[in-house]
Amino acid sequence: MGEEANDDKKPTTKFELERETELRFEVEASQSVQLELLAGMAEIFGTELTRNKKFTFDAGAKVAVFTWHGCSLQLSGRTEVAYVSKDTPMLLYLNTHTALEQMRRQAEKEEERGPRVMVVGPTDVGKSTVCRLLLNYAVRLGRRPTYVELDVGQGSVSIPGTMGALYIERPADVEEGFSIQAPLVYHFGSTTPGTNIKLYNKITSRLADVFNQRCEVNRRASVSGCVINTCGWVKGSGYQALVHAASAFEVDVVVVLDQERLYNELKRDLPHFVRTVLLPKSGGVVERSKDFRRECRDERIREYFYGFRGCFYPHAFNVKFSDVKIYKVGAPTIPDSCLPLGMSQEDNQLKLVPVTPGRDMVHHLLSVSTAEGTEENLSETSVAGFIVVTSVDLEHQVFTVLSPAPRPLPKNFLLIMDIRFMDLK
């Protein structure tokens, strides 16, 4: 490892990595860092690095560059931390991928379906990273796996507050992640499943149905299987939601990260044919504060409207109150004694409640449903995209929105989220 200064006053450090080691670094707030592979081969979460190409990572990025055979790397810019580690679970993760690939080959031979894998564990154990790794390794072998995102707090397939699926056709971009050109997305409306667990489980089942339908008509998708990312809520209703997801998707393999108790509970409660594997988390996994999570969510939403590093220009336009119908999924809970005869609180959770446009709608995100009419079940219909309300004019009965596409809105049924986005940058 050697340090030198370059022309533009950015500190530059070279790292020589031995085989099966990784360089871990975190980017300082309001800084950016450039990484370059000078010699050898290396990868980031399963995506191979191109030699002599500079990759840029923005403030808050937490990165691990792994090499199987040794390499030479250069970092330019201010990092909060940068060190090389020999202690990595990558070999175990690779073994998991190899076992899944054997299952795919067997599925091909025997005209069956490929492995459906669910990655579970508490918060901050690296679930999304393991998903990305398994998907990248599969797609590098010519597979076309489906990525299923059940983590409403993160929304890596779309934005936070949604659940969705993405057909993976190429490895994730080192800087931008997976290409999200045509995801299948459903509105959940909040960043925690506990706000409406009945809706959460219903959308999980819906995603499983749609995935099954795709597998019936697309042999390659069926053989490639899916990788399911889940929430970090693993107790009580959160645990029940994991069991429900495993059942809905008929998973074959459950990868449990870093929690023996959860591993034993799932081993006990899931059918005996489900292979449950306990894997360690990487030493590079960092605990994220509430503030950091909130910033990441905001950044994810900002990226939806403005593109990666601001490459898009969103549209602002007025929408008449009379042109749209806005709903919220789930009525407020009321005492059981006040419910109509034969109705339970659970029925209430799936109820569509009309929303009258008002000033309290400002900054809220709205999902634009693909539904043609309310006779379709709005909560189980996918969404075309999202808009954010920037102002409400009660006098003229219009509200102004920020939208990634120009007017008019493709459909007139909107679902309101609890999530707000303040466009301050």
From Swiss-Prot:
Its cofactor is Mg(2+); Mn(2+); Ni(2+). ATP binds at residues 22, 62, 124-129. The keyword Kinase applies. It holds the Pfam family CLP1_N. SUPFAM superfamilies: P-loop containing nucleoside triphosphate hydrolases. Keywords: ATP-binding, Kinase, Magnesium, Manganese, mRNA processing, Nickel, Nucleotide-binding, Nucleus, Transferase, tRNA processing. Its EC number is 2.7.1.78. GO terms for biological process: cerebellar cortex development; global gene silencing by mRNA cleavage; mRNA 3'-end processing; RISC complex assembly; tRNA splicing, via endonucleolytic cleavage and ligation. PANTHER family: CLEAVAGE/POLYADENYLATION FACTOR IA SUBUNIT CLP1P (PTHR12755), POLYRIBONUCLEOTIDE 5'-HYDROXYL-KINASE CLP1 (PTHR12755:SF6). Component of the tRNA splicing endonuclease complex, composed of CLP1, TSEN2, TSEN15, TSEN34 and TSEN54. Component of pre-mRNA cleavage complex II (CF-II). Also associates with numerous components of the pre-mRNA cleavage complex I (CF-I/CFIm), including NUDT21, CPSF2, CPSF3, CPSF6 and CPSF7. Interacts with CSTF2 and SYMPK. This is Polyribonucleotide 5'-hydroxyl-kinase Clp1. The lineage of its organism: Eukaryota, Metazoa, Chordata, Craniata, Vertebrata. The gene is CLP1.
